[in-house]
Each structure stands twice: as structure tokens, then as C-alpha cells.
Amino acid sequence: MANIKSQQKRILTNERRRLRNKSVKSSLHTAVRGFRAAVEAGDKDKAGELLASTSRKLDKAASKGVIHKNQAANRKSALAKALQKI
């Protein structure tokens, strides 16, 4: 454990952020997995709805600093491409 008071506080904030980031990334992973399952099933309507919700989640994660904005853009592009292939 750190001896400096500011570092003790930093340890606590880092842990809170780590847990928040873990939660957001987990929900992103679940959303993308659901979208890919709909694409593999060939359900274009459901995949379109899931693409919109997944894109919102990616944008929100990027705006909160959980993932980089370019990573969000690349993932959204790949998902849109997958939808177009149906």
C-alpha cells in the first residue's frame, strides 16, 4: 500500500475506473456477440436493430474514454460491413 495520501486516493479511483471499464467492455462484448449471432442466422431485421444499439454502446464507450474513438469507428465499420453481406 502506498504511503503518500494522494497515491492512496489514486489507488481507490483506479480500482473504481477499472471496474467500470470492465463492465462497459463486457456489455460491448455481449452486444457484438448478439449481433454476430443474428448475422450468422441470416436475420437482417434483428441484425439491423442490434447494429444500432451496438453502435450506440460503442460511441458511448468511446466518449467515456473506455475505448479509443478510432477503435469504436473501426468496430462499427466492421459490423456494418457484416450486415451488408447478408
UniProtKB/Swiss-Prot annotation:
GO molecular function: small ribosomal subunit rRNA binding; structural constituent of ribosome
A Pfam match: Ribosomal_S20p
GO cellular component, one term: cytosol
Keywords: Ribonucleoprotein, Ribosomal protein, RNA-binding, rRNA-binding
Annotated signal sequence range: none
Domain of life: Bacteria
GO biological process: translation
Role: Binds directly to 16S ribosomal RNA.
UniProt record similarity statement: Belongs to the bacterial ribosomal protein bS20 family.
Protein name, as recorded: Small ribosomal subunit protein bS20
Organism field: Mycolicibacterium vanbaalenii (strain DSM 7251 / JCM 13017 / BCRC 16820 / KCTC 9966 / NRRL B-24157 / PYR-1)
Gene: rpsT
